[in-house]
Amino acid sequence: GLVPPHMAGRDAARIAILLPFSSENAGARAESLRLLRAAELALFERAGSNLLLIPKDTQGTADGARAAAMAAFEDGADMIIGPLFGQVARRANIPVIAFSTDTSTAGNGVYLLSFPPELEVARVVEYASRQGVQRYAYLGPQSRYGMAVNTALRDNAGLTGAQLTAEAFYTGDVEAMASASSRLARGVFEPITPEEALVLRQSEWVPHPDAPFQAVMLPEGSTRLRTLGPLLISQAVDPLVVRFLGTGLWNDEDLLREPALHGGWFAGPDRASHERFEQSYEAAYGSRASNIASLGYDALALAAHLEGGELGFSREAIENSEGFLGIDGLFRFSSSGVIERGLAIYEVQSRGFREIEPAPLTFDPLAY
């Protein structure tokens, strides 16, 4: 492959980044550019002069991803970052840092630098259970994402000695969401009086001992979430009584305008660190970073860290049990390629997301 003149004659570490730069989907093209720019920012801020970043276009197709990976191998890539969707061919001793949330694509040298919803659910359920929640409910889409959240909710509730006692799925529009909200509530919740509401607002929330469920998981974001909250209230499922829980889809400041979501909890990365990254990105490029652009930065920063270490790009180095500190906080990879993240707990309030429990600064030792 070509080497810039200033790197001629050096034994440079080659990092290929595979993204759908020419995808038919305009959103994917825009996200690819943001991820590449974030990686270039990390190259400037974190890497030495011995790292070469090589962009490859996957075109947003499986065939394109395979061709891009083969081209990266032929260019002598020491590590591959990407793709954004799906998976690429694996080659011995060349690690892949992919952005997929589909854990079935991980392993055998493929590591997922992403935000799997299972992690977010595990963290918020662990926190809610410590606050006394014993009975959980699920209200969400019957999609691959929704089913992953539902399974994680059931599993993690069980780990804390709690139960998933009610669930309702929907596919489609507001009418389907309203019908599911009604099925979930089953008419067993009594509307609270204005006097009761005043008392509840002035006191610390505790799980209601007689409620059929004390917390409900709503794995939606944006407009659909702003619709779902009021639909539950219309069924007398009041957030003053039942705690609303979310996933990383809640990490969107547009949601602050919806009073039905105030008081809700979700798990997410350290916001202070992410905001510093957003400021650096905007200063460098004059445009805003997306929520996942930081993954491009952390992937390249990880490559720079590995390149400077004694173990290089080996699995042993990538699977360091102490983990790495990135833009989105602490993370580490298991031997199966799945990511573990240190996440904070946030409460939705009218003026912003309030951190109610910080992200951990260190990981517990891995159990073997």
Kindly give the residue locations of the regions a language model identified.
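Extracytosolic ligand-binding ectodomains
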Residues: G1-Y368
